[in-house]
Curated annotation (Swiss-Prot):
Pfam families hit by this protein: Carb_kinase (PF01256)
Gene transcribed to yield this protein: Naxd
Binding site for (6S)-NADPHX: G114, N167, V168, M169, E170, F171, Q172, R173, D229
InterPro entries for this protein: Carbohydrate_kinase_pred_CS, CARKD, Ribokinase-like
Biological role stated in the UniProt entry: Catalyzes the dehydration of the S-form of NAD(P)HX at the expense of ATP, which is converted to ADP. Together with NAD(P)HX epimerase, which catalyzes the epimerization of the S- and R-forms, the enzyme allows the repair of both epimers of NAD(P)HX, a damaged form of NAD(P)H that is a result of enzymatic or heat-dependent hydration.
GO biological process: metabolite repair; nicotinamide nucleotide metabolic process
Binding site for ATP: 198-202, 219-228
Keyword Phosphoprotein on entry: yes
Known EC number: 4.2.1.93
This protein's name: ATP-dependent (S)-NAD(P)H-hydrate dehydratase
Enzymatic class: lyase
Family in the record: Belongs to the NnrD/CARKD family.
This protein's record includes keyword NADP: yes
Amino acid sequence: MAAVSDIPVHLPKLLALFKTVVPKLVNNKHKGQYGRIGVIGGSLEYTGAPYFAAISSIRVGADLAHVFCHSNASAIIKSYSPDLIVHPVLDCVDAVERIAPWLERLHVVVIGPGLGREPGILKTASNVLKLCMDTKKPVVIDADGLFLLNDNLNLICGQPNVILTPNVMEFQRLFGEDDQAARQKMSLLGAGVTVLEKGANDKIYLPHCNEVHSMPSGGSGRRCGGQGDLLSGSLATFFSWSLQSGEPNPALVAACASSYFVKKLNAAAFQKFGRSLLASDMVNQIPSVFQTEFENSDPQ
């Protein structure tokens, strides 16, 4: 294999580039044009994950967020926020048929937050993923969505506009612990698949060209449940904007921006709450951190 190029991300350049991707707020747009995001996930045990993914997607600026969850989780997720559209369908026998018409309207779909490991639900999620691949729907795959790929990586090989967001352990389960073997396996993914490996220093892999873009460290020493869901949700919105803007490297730009953004959220919340920091505290930092880091000086 060709040598891997490890490219440190130049933050000033990234921030300047992403500001051109963020859509300007104008009065002649209608609801939905700034982003319609779907989240496939949510079970009785895991209701927070899909909520955090969906709420972060609209907090950063998408107009609408849909959560497609198990019926047992629906009322709980609805109680967290009236701003989310919740569909209790994942355990229905005709779940895919019910979800399909909504998929046509969505810009990006996040598969995995709070999905759980129930075989029937995993099968439904797998079929939804296949439908997304068949229709070339951009997807972000996280958490239990990555579990689906452990033995079925071919589901996404050669597909366009796919971003995986594994943590270190999920990355090793997908691609192995040996660096060379992992690069070899990733090379089969194709040019349309991007891998964002989360860690102290996030890494964004472009397997087709043997590039690894390394993000600087950031955030704090406090790790709390839900932070990865904030990343997948904000990433989905950033991805939709990058695609709509015509940016030539939409997945790379969105992945770098979301990695940087979530670490900034963590740092801002840690300043206020320290060891007591929770994911909900990070959600509350989204408006101020986004304004400081990404907002154009002239919103009009």
